[in-house]
Structures are given as C-alpha cells and as structure tokens.
C-alpha cells in the first residue's frame, strides 16, 4: 500500500509487467487494503509473497497483512520502506520518494531473478514475435 494513488497504480502495473511479462511468473499485485477481501485465501506455505510496507498512513494495513501471512507462509519477503535512508528528504515528501525508490529496488530484484533463472528480461514468447 502507499501514499499516492498514482504511484500505487504505477507500482502495481510495474510489478505485473516485471514478473508476468518479463519473467513469465504467475503473480498478482494486491493492495494491503484489499488483501482481506478474498485474496488472503491463496496464502499457503508454498505460495511466495512480497510485501511492500509503506511509511505512509496505510502502514497499519501492511502490518496486518504481514502478521497474517507470517502464520501461513514461510516464503514472505518484506521490503520495508522504513529501511530506506530518507534522512535528507522533507517529511511531507518521504512517502512519495520511498515509493519511487521501492520501484528501483524491485527492478533490481527482478533483474537478479532473471540472472538466476537464465531468463533475460528482453525475452518474449508472443510479444513482437508474431502478429496478434
């Protein structure tokens, strides 16, 4: 979850783009506020989760998701924006800057996945390969 709906929507689209389109990993992006409206039913020991804990006013939602998910999966990666050094950023701008930096961290994470899997981020199965 996060401060700006524009950055949130961009983040959701970016994660879908990186994991699904570029790595062919079946995934979904769920706002913490929506998690308990059904998506939490897929939480299981063999289902990996990546949680971005915001520093904004929705952090309590992220913490609620984290507390629940920890009980039912051992494959939970938490990217906590509190771990970012934002000491030189104005307080009112921190949630926005944190959202942007989180996108950079996730991009590097996906690049590492691509390297480990031997699946370049440039490879496409259908896109640009044929008429569709």
Outline where the language-model segments fall.
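A SIS-like phosphosugar-recognition module
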Residues: 1-132
């Amino acid at each position: 979850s996060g401060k700006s709906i524009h950055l949130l929507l961009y983040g959701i689209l970016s994660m879908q783009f990186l994991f699904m389109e570029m790595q062919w990993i079946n995934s979904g992006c769920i706002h913490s506020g929506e998690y308990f409206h059904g998506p939490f039913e897929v939480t299981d020991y063999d289902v990996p989760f990546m949680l971005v804990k915001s520093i904004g006013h929705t952090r309590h939602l992220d913490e609620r998701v984290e507390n629940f998910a920890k009980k039912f999966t051992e494959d939970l990666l938490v990217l906590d924006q509190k771990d970012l050094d934002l000491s030189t950023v104005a307080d009112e701008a921190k949630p926005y800057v944190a959202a942007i930096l989180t996108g950079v961290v996730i991009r590097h994470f996906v690049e590492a996945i691509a390297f480990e899997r031997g699946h370049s981020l440039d490879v496409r199965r259908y896109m640009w390969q044929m008429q569709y």
